UniProtKB/Swiss-Prot annotation:
The entry's keywords: Cytoplasm, Elongation factor, Protein biosynthesis
Keyword Cytoplasm tagged: yes
GO molecular function, one term: translation elongation factor activity
Family: Belongs to the elongation factor P family.
Name of the molecule in the record: Elongation factor P
Species lineage: Bacteria, Pseudomonadati, Thermodesulfobacteriota, Desulfobacteria, Desulfobacterales
Pathway: Protein biosynthesis; polypeptide chain elongation
Entry annotated with the keyword Transferase: no
One CC-aspect GO term: cytoplasm
HAMAP family linked: EF_P
Length: 187
């Protein structure tokens, strides 16, 4: 159990049997009375959000979450198949739990899969992925008047802004947290 004073942004708690993550946290000390802790909580199963205020001394349950390294194998038409990197067990994750990372998810990528009561509830990509460019406008040397970046499509279908010298077939490194171009991967 967490005391209200231990709550912080990003902390995962359990309320009424569901896991929540604290999206925003604010400490409020009124002129008179107990300190208050205002939290914006997001249900990790449904995605719904709500605000809740705790008083000092209130207790909140810890979410029983487990994170495992798993490799994304394939999409079977309905679910995404992941394999545990230590036990080699395979699980199927519904599209709703993969939606946030789908545009950068490539086969054979090792991800962190979050489990609640032995059920996969979320997938986190590594901080950086390397993907090949499949579509890009051609670059004309000396063409700097049109701006510093151009849109390209990578092999997963995601559209990104990259420097104009990047061409089709090249592999680029992408920061998955911001979906920004980092660098061209040297062969």
């Amino acid at each position: 159990m967490y005391e209200a004073g231990e709550l912080r942004k990003g902390l995962k708690v359990e309320i009424d049997g569901d896991p929540y993550v604290i999206m925003e946290f604010e400490f409020v000390k009124p002129g008179k009375g107990q300190a208050l802790y205002k939290c914006k909580l997001k249900n990790m199963l449904t995605g719904s959000q709500y605000d809740h205020t705790y008083r000092s001394g209130d207790k909140v349950g810890r979410a029983n979450l487990e994170e495992r390294k798993m490799e994304y194998l394939y999409f079977d038409g309905e679910n995404y198949c992941f394999m545990d990197c230590t036990t080699y067990d395979q699980i199927f994750v519904p599209p709703s739990q993969v939606a946030e990372v789908l545009d950068l998810l490539k086969e054979n990528t090792v991800c962190d899969v979050l489990f609640f009561d032995n059920r996969a509830i979320g997938v986190t990509l590594p901080n950086f992925v390397e993907l090949a460019i499949t579509e890009a406008d051609p670059w004309v040397k000396g063409d700097t008047a049109s701006g510093s970046n151009k849109p390209v499509t990578v092999e997963t279908g995601c559209v990104l802004q990259v420097p104009p010298f990047i061409e089709v077939g090249e592999v680029i490194k992408i920061d998955t947290r911001t979906k920004n171009y980092v660098e061209r991967v040297k062969k």
